[in-house]
Amino acid sequence: MDKKTQALVEQYARSLVEVAFEQDAVSTIQEEVRQILTVFAETNLKTFLSQVNVTSEAKKESLSFFQESCSVYMNNFLEVISLNDRANILYDVLKLVLELFDQEDNTYDVTVTSASPLSEEQKTRLLTIVSQKFEIKTRRLVEKIDEELIGGFVIKAKNKFVDTSIRSQLQAFKMNLK
């Protein structure tokens, strides 16, 4: 994404976040953004809205489906996106909106990659430790399995990264032998 487009994405995202806080509608808008992003994930909507050969009217019609079930603030936002012919950046704007909300309330998802599934007790303990060590509030734990780790785990949250996997320890050991 070029700098001009990135600046547009940031401008639209910050505007929606500001409205959410001004109107005390943060939780509503967060939920609506998540629902719209779920639709993006389950369909090829991002590709459709990015197509140059798709008319503005077709893009506007696609966005109107969201407007039927969204708050007035989200409706207005989607209307501005449509009127300014910016549907092609909507996905990136919405992703950034969630990031900005996370930064604002210091709440983040925690991604844990391990060689085998974690028990519920391990997940609970891990969330508590991550919350304390990273000084964040944890929203939820996203668990991924990667058998190539051999053992241990990799934690990602708030742009921080902790790798205690046996694979990385073996790689570090290998580098020290050189």
Curated annotation (Swiss-Prot):
Compartment(s) where it occurs, according to its Swiss-Prot or TrEMBL record: Cell membrane
InterPro entries on file: ATP_synth_OSCP/delta_N_sf, ATPase_OSCP/dsu
Membrane disposition: Peripheral membrane protein
Molecular functions per Gene Ontology: proton-transporting ATP synthase activity, rotational mechanism
Keywords: ATP synthesis, Cell membrane, CF(1), Hydrogen ion transport, Ion transport, Membrane, Transport
A Gene Ontology term for the protein's cellular component: plasma membrane
Major site of localization recorded for this protein: membrane
Transport keyword on record: yes
Keyword Membrane attached: yes
NCBIfam families xref list: ATP_synt_delta (TIGR01145), PRK05758.2-1 (NF004401)
Family of this protein: Belongs to the ATPase delta chain family.
Record text on subunit structure and interactions: F-type ATPases have 2 components, F(1) - the catalytic core - and F(0) - the membrane proton channel. F(1) has five subunits: alpha(3), beta(3), gamma(1), delta(1), epsilon(1). F(0) has three main subunits: a(1), b(2) and c(10-14). The alpha and beta chains form an alternating ring which encloses part of the gamma chain. F(1) is attached to F(0) by a central stalk formed by the gamma and epsilon chains, while a peripheral stalk is formed by the delta and b chains.
Function: F(1)F(0) ATP synthase produces ATP from ADP in the presence of a proton or sodium gradient. F-type ATPases consist of two structural domains, F(1) containing the extramembraneous catalytic core and F(0) containing the membrane proton channel, linked together by a central stalk and a peripheral stalk. During catalysis, ATP synthesis in the catalytic domain of F(1) is coupled via a rotary mechanism of the central stalk subunits to proton translocation.
Name the record gives this protein: ATP synthase subunit delta
